[in-house]
C-alpha cells in the first residue's frame, strides 16, 4: 500500500535508486496504490550517469509491495520491500532491465514489457 510520501526502491536500470510517491493516479480522492498501479514520484537518490537524475519527477508502476495482494484463489502475495519501475507514458519501461521478481497482477494490467523483462514472475 503506497501513499503520498512513501519511499520505494527502483527495480530497473534507469539510474534511480529510491523514489518518493508524490501522487497516486486514478482519481482525485484516491489515497493508496498497490501492485500494478501507476504513481507519480520524485527521484530521491540516483547513481551518477543514469537516465534519470535526483529531483526528476517520473511516472512509475508498483511491482512489489509489502502489503499483501489477494489473488482470486484466496491466496496472498507479499514482498519484503516496496519497489517500482519507472515507465514512459505508453506503459513501457524507461530502463532495459528489471531486477528482482514481479507480481503476476502486472500481466492483467497490461504491463507486458515489464513482465517479459523480469527474471521471475510470482
From Swiss-Prot:
Record-level GO cellular component terms: cytosolic large ribosomal subunit
Keywords from the named record: Ribonucleoprotein, Ribosomal protein, RNA-binding, rRNA-binding
UniProt-listed Gene3D superfamilies: Ribosomal protein L14
Domain of life: Bacteria
A Pfam family recorded for this sequence: Ribosomal_L14
rRNA-binding found in the keyword field: yes
CDD domains: Ribosomal_uL14
Biological process according to GO: translation
The keyword 4Fe-4S is annotated on this UniProt entry: no
GO molecular function annotations of the record: large ribosomal subunit rRNA binding; structural constituent of ribosome
Entries under InterPro entries matching the protein: Ribosomal_uL14 (IPR000218), Ribosomal_uL14_bac-type (IPR005745), Ribosomal_uL14_sf (IPR036853)
Family: Belongs to the universal ribosomal protein uL14 family.
Function of the protein: Binds to 23S rRNA. Forms part of two intersubunit bridges in the 70S ribosome.
Subunit structure: Part of the 50S ribosomal subunit. Forms a cluster with proteins L3 and L19. In the 70S ribosome, L14 and L19 interact and together make contacts with the 16S rRNA in bridges B5 and B8.
Stated name of the protein: Large ribosomal subunit protein uL14
Originating organism: Ruminiclostridium cellulolyticum (strain ATCC 35319 / DSM 5812 / JCM 6584 / H10)
